[in-house]
From Swiss-Prot:
KW Ribonucleoprotein (keyword) present: yes
Annotated protein name in UniProt: Large ribosomal subunit protein eL18
Top-level taxon in the UniProt lineage: Archaea
Origin organism lineage: Archaea, Methanobacteriati, Methanobacteriota, Thermococci, Thermococcales
GO terms classed as biological process: translation
């Protein structure tokens, strides 16, 4: 059976954008994130804020190629970019002084991808 990839038009647009930026900026991290987002939905990353709190340091830029969920607590001030956020995850990140942004916003802020950590 032929693999079709994601059917969500917004996700397809994001994957094309990631590949384009990877080629323009000569940065492999965006191509890697595009590849991870192309996976089937049941294999895509789902990261709880407790995991972000456990492994991140204050000021880190984290990319989650999937969903960020609200289980646990977060006390660190981090910038988290992801495909989707649950309402509680977004609220907890912002209450801790961090930012919950889209992957496109992160690329606009940091086109070279320096200092970005991929978390799955």
């Amino acid at each position: 059976m032929k693999r079709t990839g994601p059917t969500d038009p917004n996700l397809r647009r994001l994957i094309r954008y990631l590949r384009k930026k990877s080629n323009e900026e000569k940065v492999k991290i965006w191509k890697d994130i595009a590849w991870r987002l192309e996976r089937p939905r049941r294999q895509r990353a789902e990261v709880n804020v407790s995991r972000i709190n456990r492994y991140a340091k204050d000021g880190d830029m984290i990319v989650v190629p999937g969903s960020v969920l609200g289980a646990g607590k977060i006390e660190k001030k981090v910038i988290v970019a992801a495909w989707k956020f649950s309402e509680t995850a977004r609220r907890k990140i912002e209450e801790a002084g961090g930012e919950a942004i889209t992957i496109e916003e992160l690329i606009k802020r940091n086109p070279k991808g320096s200092g970005v950590i991929i978390m799955e």
